[in-house]
C-alpha cells in the first residue's frame, strides 16, 4: 500500500529650460513672462510640451489629462504631456524615488519606461506596516494604463508592495505592459528591432507584477522580456498574499506576447494566484517559463488553497488556465501543486487548444503535471492542434489529470476520499509524454484518484505511463478508470505501473457498495479507427503487500485475499489493438478472465498476449474480408492459380462522408473483383459509367463497397452497365452506405435493386 500523510500548514509565515534673448520684449510678452514666473513660484501648472522625466529628480505622479498626461515632479505639474518618457540618468545606480500612475475613469494613461532603475526595498525596518514602505511603480484608478518598455528596466519594491503594482478592485482599470515600438520610437518589423525588458521584484507577500499584500492583482502583457519574482506568499505575476477571510490573493493575468519568466514565492503561483488566492490565466502567445519555488502554488494557476475550520470552505487554490497559443517552455508547481492548474486543494480547470505548445509541465510531489494539486479535482480539455511534449508528476499526481486524493484511518478501517481527474483529448491534439513518478496515472487520476478520460477525433498519444500502481490511462492507485476512446485515435504506448492496467484501473482498487467498475469503451467512427498499444503493469514484489501483474485493458490487481474490481469493456466497429498483460489476462479482469467481442468490423485485429508472451487471443479478435459469393466464385478464372489481392487506383473515383467532404478510401483487386473500402458510417462512392466501362475492359466483373457498420454490398459490372446502356460516359454513379442500409443511383435514378 502507499503511505499518505495529512498535512498541517500555516502561513508564517522636469526643470524649465533657460534661454538668452537679445531682442526687447513687448509689454504683452513681459506680462506673460511675469505670470509664468509667478506660476513657478507658487507651484501652479505649466502649459503642455513633451519631455523626458528623470527619476533622480524626484517622485513622479502621472494622471490622465484632456489631451495627454498631467505629470507632477518636484512640486510642478505639466499638463497634457503628449509623450511621457521616464528615464534614469544613470541606470546602473538605482533611485529611491517612485512613480505613481492614476488613470481616471474612462481615461487612458500611456507611459514609457526607458532604462529606469528603482529600488525602494528597505528590508523590514518598520516592522509589519506595509503603508510605511514604498512602491517602485504603482498603477491605480478606474482607467487604463499602458506601459511601453524601452531598454532595460528594473523595479524593486519594499515590504508589502509589488515591484510593478496594480491592485485589482471592483472599479479598477487595466494595466498593460507592452513593447510596441523600438527603443528609438520607430515601428517594429525589421531585423534590427530592439526588445524592451522589465525586471520586477515584489516585497514580502507581494507579487513581482500585480497585487500587493492582501490584494488581488490584474496584469496584461503583450510584449517585452519580462522577469518577475514574487515575495513570500505571492505570485511572480498575479496576486499578492491573501488571507483566510478570503481577502486578496487572486491573480488575473492575460499574456498575448513576450518572453516571460515568472517565479512565485512560497505558497504563490509562478503566474496566477498568491496564497489563499485563485489564479485566472489566459495565454494566447508568448514564450513562458513559470515556477513556484516553495510549496503549494502552481507553476501557472492557483496559489495555496486552505479549508479553515470550522466552516471547512475552500479559500483560494483554484486555477483556471486557458492556453490557445504560444509556448510554455516550463511550468513547475511547488510541493502538492500542479505544473499548470491548481495549487494545493484547488480545482484545476485547464483548456489547452489552438496551436499551443507545452514543452514541460512538471507537478510537484502529489500534484499533477497538468491538472490539480493535492486533494483537488480537475477538468481538462486539450484540443485543436495543441502539443504536449511532456507533462509529469514527480510522485502521486497524474501526468495529466488530478493530484493525490486522501486516505486516512477511521476506526478499524480506512476512509478513501478520491480526487477525480476529468480529461478530454480531442481534435488533432498530440500528447508526446504523460507520466507519473509513483502512484498516479499517466493520464487520469492521481494516487487515490479516479480517472475519467475521453480520447477522440484524431488525437495522438505517444507515451502514457503510470507510476507504480497507477494506470497508463485511467485510475491512479486505489482508483477506478472510466476511459472512452473513439475515432482515428492513435495510442502508441499506454503502460501501467506495477499492478495497474495499461488502460483502466489502478492497483488495489476493491469493490464498493455500488459495484463501481472499471469501464473502457473503444470504437471506430467516421473519423477513423483506433490503433492502440497497451501493456499492463507487472508484478509488485513487496513482501508486505505483493501484487500480481495487471491487464493491458481492464482492471488493476489487488493483494492476496482481496477482491478485484470487475471491468466492463466494449469494443465496436473496426479497431487495431495490441494488448500485453502484466499477468495472465490481457483484456478483462481476474474474476471474469478474458473479455470476448463479437460483431466487429472487417479489418479488426486484436492481439493478446500474457506476461509470458503466450497468445491468449479470443474468437472474434480478427475479422477478415468476407469470402466471395457463389456468383463471384463462379466468375473467377479457372487457371488453377491462386489470386492475390493487390492495391489498385481507379482514376477519378472518390468517396465522400455525410457532409459531402472527401474522405480517404482504398481500392484493391482480387481476380475479377474490385473492392472499395472507406472508414465511414455514412459514405458514398462516386463513379461514372465511363469508369465502369474501363474497369470491364480491364477484366473486372464485380464491384464491392465496404464501410464501417455496414455489410459489404456488391454489384455486377454487366448488370450496372445494362441498367443504362445508352447513357454517356460522364453519367454519375453514386453508391451510398448509411449504416446498415445501401443505395445505388445512376444519373439520380434509383437502381438499388442491383445490389447484393
Can you describe what each PLM-predicted range is?
Residues 85-87, 108-114, 119-121, 128-133, ...:
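Long, contiguous ectodomains of secretory-pathway proteins
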Residues 26, 30, 660:
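Residue-level detector of functional hotspots within protein domains
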Residues 2-3, 9, 16, 30-36, ...:
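A composition-driven surface/loop motif
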Residues 15-27:
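Short, Lys/Arg-rich N-terminal segment immediately upstream of the first membrane anchor
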Amino acid at each position: 500500500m502507499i503511505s499518505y500523510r495529512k498535512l498541517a500548514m500555516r502561513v508564517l509565515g522636469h526643470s524649465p529650460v533657460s534661454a538668452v534673448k537679445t531682442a526687447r520684449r513687448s509689454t504683452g510678452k513681459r506680462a506673460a513672462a511675469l505670470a509664468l514666473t509667478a506660476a513657478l513660484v507658487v507651484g501652479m501648472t505649466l502649459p503642455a510640451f513633451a519631455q523626458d522625466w528623470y527619476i533622480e529628480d524626484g517622485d513622479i505622479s502621472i494622471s490622465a489629462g484632456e489631451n495627454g498626461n498631467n505629470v507632477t515632479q518636484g512640486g510642478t505639474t505639466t499638463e497634457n504631456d503628449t509623450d511621457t518618457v521616464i528615464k534614469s540618468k544613470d541606470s546602473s545606480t538605482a533611485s529611491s524615488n517612485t512613480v505613481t500612475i492614476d488613470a481616471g475613469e474612462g481615461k487612458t494613461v500611456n507611459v514609457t519606461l526607458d532604462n529606469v532603475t528603482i529600488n525602494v526595498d528597505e528590508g523590514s525596518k518598520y516592522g509589519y506596516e506595509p503603508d510605511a514602505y514604498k512602491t517602485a511603480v504603482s498603477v491605480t484608478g478606474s482607467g487604463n494604463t499602458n506601459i511601453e518598455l524601452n531598454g532595460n528596466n528594473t523595479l524593486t519594491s519594499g515590504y508589502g508592495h509589488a515591484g510593478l503594482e496594480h491592485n485589482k478592485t471592483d472599479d479598477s482599470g487595466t494595466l498593460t505592459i507592452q513593447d510596441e515600438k523600438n527603443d528609438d520610437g520607430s515601428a517594429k518589423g525589421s531585423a534590427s528591432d530592439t526588445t524592451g525588458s522589465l525586471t520586477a521584484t515584489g516585497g514580502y507577500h507581494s507579487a513581482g507584477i500585480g497585487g500587493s499584500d492582501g490584494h488581488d492583482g490584474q496584469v496584461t502583457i503583450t510584449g517585452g522580456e519580462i522577469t518577475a519574482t514574487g515575495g513570500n506568499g505571492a505570485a511572480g505575476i498575479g496576486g499578492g498574499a491573501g488571507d483566510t477571510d478570503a481577502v486578496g490573493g487572486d491573480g488575473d493575468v492575460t499574456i498575448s506576447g513576450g518572453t516571460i519568466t515568472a517565479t512565485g514565492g512560497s505558497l504563490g503561483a509562478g503566474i496566477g494566484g498568491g496564497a489563499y488566492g485563485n489564479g485566472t490565466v489566459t495565454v494566447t502567445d508568448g514564450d513562458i517559463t513559470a515556477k513556484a519555488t516553495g510549496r503549494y502554488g502552481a507553476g501557472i494557476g492557483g496559489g495555496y488553497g486552505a479549508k479553515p475550520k470550522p466552516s471547512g470552505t475552500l479559500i483560494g487554490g483554484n486555477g483556471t488556465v486557458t492556453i490557445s497559443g504560444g509556448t510554455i517552455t516550463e511550468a513547475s508547481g511547488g510541493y502538492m501543486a500542479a505544473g499548470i492548474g491548481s495549487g494545493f486543494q484547488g480545482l484545476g480547470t485547464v483548456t489547452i487548444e489552438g496551436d499551443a505548445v507545452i514543452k514541460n509541465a512538471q507537478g510537484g510531489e502529489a500534484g499533477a503535471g497538468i491538472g490539480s494539486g493535492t486533494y483537488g479535482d480537475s477538468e481538462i480539455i486539450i484540443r485543436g492542434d495543441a502539443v504536449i511534449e511532456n507533462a509529469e508528476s514527480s510522485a502521486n499526481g497524474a501526468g495529466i489529470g488530478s493530484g493525490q486524493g486522501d486516505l486516512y484511518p477511521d476506526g478499524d478501517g480506512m476512509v478513501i476520499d478520491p480526487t477525480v481527474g476529468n480529461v478530454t483529448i480531442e481534435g488533432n491534439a498530440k500528447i508526446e509524454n504523460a507520466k507519473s513518478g509513483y502512484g498516479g496515472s499517466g493520464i487520469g487520476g492521481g494516487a487515490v484518484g479516479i480517472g475519467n478520460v475521453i480520447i477522440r477525433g484524431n488525437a495522438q498519444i505517444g507515451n502514457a505511463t503510470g507510476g507504480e500502481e497507477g494506470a497508463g490511462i485511467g485510475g491512479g492507485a486505489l482508483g477506478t478508470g472510466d476511459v472512452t476512446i473513439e475515432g482515428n485515435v492513435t495510442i502508441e504506448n499506454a503502460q501501467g505501473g506495477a499492478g495497474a492496467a495499461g488502460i483502466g484501473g489502478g492497483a488495489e482498487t476493491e469493490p464498493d457498495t455500488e459495484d463501481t467498475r472499471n469501464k473502457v469503451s473503444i470504437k471506430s467512427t467516421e473519423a477513423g479507427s483506433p490503433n492502440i498499444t497497451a501493456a499492463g503493469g507487472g508484478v509488485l514484489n513487496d513482501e508486505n503487500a505483493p501484487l500480481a501483474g495487471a491487464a493491458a485493458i481492464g482492471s488493476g490487481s489487488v493483494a492476496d485475499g482481496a477482491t478485484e474490481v470487475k471491468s466492463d469493456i466494449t469494443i465496436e466497429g473496426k479497431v487495431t489493438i495490441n494488448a500485453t498483460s502484466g499477468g495472465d489476462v490481457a483484456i478483462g479482469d481476474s474474476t471474469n478472465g478474458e473479455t470476448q467481442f463479437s460483431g466487429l468490423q472487417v479489418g479488426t485485429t486484436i492481439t493478446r498476449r500474457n506476461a509470458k508472451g503466450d497468445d491468449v487471443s479470443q474468437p472474434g479478435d480478427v475479422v477478415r474480408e468476407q469470402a466471395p459469393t457463389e456468383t463471384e466464385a463462379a466468375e473467377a478464372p479457372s487457371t488453377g492459380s491462386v489470386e492475390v489481392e493487390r492495391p489498385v487506383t481507379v482514376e477519378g473515383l472518390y468517396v465522400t462522408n455525410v457532409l459531402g467532404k472527401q474522405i480517404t478510401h482504398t481500392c484493391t483487386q482480387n481476380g475479377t473483383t474490385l473492392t472499395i473500402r472507406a472508414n465511414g458510417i455514412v459514405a458514398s462512392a462516386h463513379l461514372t459509367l465511363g469508369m465502369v466501362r474501363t474497369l470491364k475492359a480491364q477484366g473486372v466483373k464485380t464491384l464491392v463497397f465496404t464501410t464501417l457498420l455496414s455489410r459489404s454490398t456488391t454489384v455486377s459490372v454487366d448488370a450496372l452497365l445494362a441498367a443504362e446502356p445508352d447513357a454517356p460516359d460522364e453519367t454519375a454513379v453514386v453508391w451510398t452506405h448509411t449504416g446498415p442500409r445501401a443505395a445505388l443511383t445512376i444519373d439520380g435514378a434509383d437502381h438499388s435493386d442491383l445490389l447484393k
